[in-house]
Amino acid sequence: MLTAENIQLNCYETVYILKSDLNEDKTLSIINDYKSMLTNGGAKNIVLQHRGRRHLSYTINDYHDGIYVQVNYEGNGQLVKSFEKSLRFDDNIIRYLTNKQKRNIKKDS
């Protein structure tokens, strides 16, 4: 039986790219909204890195530049599924990718 004491949390890394024509206030608002979404969903040890504007290797939706954001966190598969669904339907996100890291953390409390 699964209880809160023995739930396995997996480590994930999500990188998403925002449209380059967003102003700084809108960019920070989107980043903070997604961070709070992870926190409310039960993610632990959230590390957010705002990588800034970078040139894309190839054009995506007529954009040559994008604003990169990297988020590392611990959570379960359901959290990742809902997080990716939100990213998929956000018009300000032009691309995202989530990778599961090898290390597992056992939740103690």
Curated annotation (Swiss-Prot):
InterPro entries, sorted: Ribosomal_bS6, Ribosomal_bS6_CS, Ribosomal_bS6_sf, Ribosomal_S6_plastid/chlpt, Transl_elong_EF1B/ribsomal_bS6
Entry-linked CDD domains: bS6_chloro_cyano
UniProt-listed SUPFAM superfamilies: Ribosomal protein S6
One GO MF annotation is: structural constituent of ribosome
GO terms (BP aspect): translation
Major place of residence: plastid
Q: What Gene Ontology cellular-component terms does the record carry? A: chloroplast; ribonucleoprotein complex; ribosome
Gene3D superfamilies in alphabetical order: 3.30.70.60
Per UniProt, subcellular location reads as:
Plastid, Chloroplast
> Sorted alphabetically, which keywords does the UniProt record give?
Chloroplast, Plastid, Ribonucleoprotein, Ribosomal protein, RNA-binding, rRNA-binding
What the protein does comes down to:
Binds together with bS18 to 16S ribosomal RNA.
Regarding protein family, the annotation reads: Belongs to the bacterial ribosomal protein bS6 family.
Query: What is the protein name stated in its UniProt record?
Result: Small ribosomal subunit protein bS6c
